[in-house]
């Protein structure tokens, strides 16, 4: 069962099993839910590589990466951008974590991170910037349905501590 947050965004409830996934990262490695079991996992959904808000959010996770790792968690970013875009984004900003290629946005849909958005009076469907923390058993431990890109990495680190 899903709950609704915000206008129409269906979110996975706390303590529910995370939806399964198996996606390639920027280097072609397959990352799956099964491969992440046994440790805490931060999954953040973002609209697009190398755009202002997405860059600030990624750099916030980068700047807090050592603390998040020391807290026993893995960070994973997810967008529909391709491998080349993800590699360049990670290289340009020295991102030390995997960026998954969600071609077709199925993972975003499964996690409730896809929905209606509007910009400049135009309504469209897209990735909604949101974050999940999964516990070592693959269950939802925390959800942020809306995030502040500049400080979200430190917010996640504070929660993990």
Which positions does each model-derived feature cover?
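Chalcogenol-based redox active-site neighborhoods
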Residues: 2-161
């Amino acid at each position: 069962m899903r709950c609704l947050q915000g206008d129409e965004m269906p979110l996975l409830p706390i303590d529910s099993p995370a939806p399964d996934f198996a996606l390639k990262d920027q280097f072609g490695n397959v990352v799956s839910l099964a491969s992440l079991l046994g440790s805490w996992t931060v999954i953040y959904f973002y609209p697009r590589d190398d755009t202002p808000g997405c860059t600030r959010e990624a750099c916030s996770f980068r700047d807090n990466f050592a603390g998040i790792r020391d807290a026993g968690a893995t960070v994973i970013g997810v967008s529909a951008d391709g491998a080349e875009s993800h590699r360049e984004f990670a290289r340009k900003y020295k991102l030390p974590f995997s960026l998954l290629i969600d071609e077709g946005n199925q993972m975003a849909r499964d996690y409730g991170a896809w929905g209606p958005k509007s910009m400049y009076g135009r309504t469209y469907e897209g990735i909604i910037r949101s974050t999940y923390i999964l516990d070592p058993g693959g269950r939802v431990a925390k959800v942020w349905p809306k995030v502040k890109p500049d400080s979200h990495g430190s917010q996640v680190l504070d929660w993990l501590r």
